[in-house]
Amino acid sequence: MQKLFREIGFACLLLVLALLLVFSLFWALSIGTVKLPVREIYETVLAQFTSGEPITAPGQGPVHDIVWLLRLPRVILASLVGCGLAVCGVIMQAIVKNPLADPYILGISSGASLGATSAILLGICVSLGPNFVGIAAFIGAFAISLAVLFISNLGGRSNSMKLLLAGMALSAVCGAFSSFIVYFANNKEGMQTIAYWMMGSLAGAKWGELAIIAPIIMASVIFFWTQSRVLNLMLLGDESAITMGTDLHAYRQWYLLISSLIVGFAVYAAGMIGFVGLIIPHVIRMFTGPDHKRLIPVSSLTGAIFLVICDGLCRIIIPHTELPIGILISMIGAPSFIYLMIKKTYGFGGND
């Protein structure tokens, strides 16, 4: 009976979060330089779905263009990136058994940024097609992921401190190379894009990007949710997992590959947005516990809500000016990271 009540409570929590996500989406659609009533937004979206017109077709009125071509792709991208980064944080923390792990802190986001910077300013990977920037960002993210694991295992078994130090060092290296490329690149338009993009922004969201990013992130989140048992075993350690008949080495490589894919395309679409993968999983773990069957769906919804709200705030904090979302997230995330670093019980179960 107690288990039944827990399952009902968990289902209610997911329902509440889903409703909060819908509410935050409509709120974000209504604010900005031009404020729109929620009813008008609802009617515009409903009319577009029932009209049969292509989703990118302009010229159906100013409200339609604002809602459908500018704001809706943006808020959907915010929810997808928030969802993906939060789940990546959960996975990274399970892989390295460190609740302070996060794609940004471990340097993976910086690797993706270096890959994307190289693609935009130097034309690297341009032969791979129209989505070459996303592919280059993924390659950079995955390469840094492997490098962090390799360096942290040098001179003995990896531990939390070695992982954090390796990630921070490689993040600095990637930042230095990115700055070097920007400094010497003879591409003014590309340099302006990179400068704004490194601060994080969802302003350039387009339906074409969503058609690529949405399936990748949603499929990855669902995949990780189906892997909850293996992720729970990772928290117990390799020896315990082997006694239960599971070798975690191959799983870590696959999870790292898929996480890098999410981070790469998130950085490609939204720029450098840090700390989402650190803050959200840690807060949610305090309510759901370390069980990934609960942690992953709750973190994904909360991450989506968090980034949608932050993006909305970036548009209204300073009148007539949009604050890059990476700045706001860092102002929230950096103090949170310091707090977790000095807190004595920041482990998966509160005792690590």
Predicted regions and their residues:
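Alpha-helical transmembrane segments in inner-membrane proteins
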Residues: 1-352
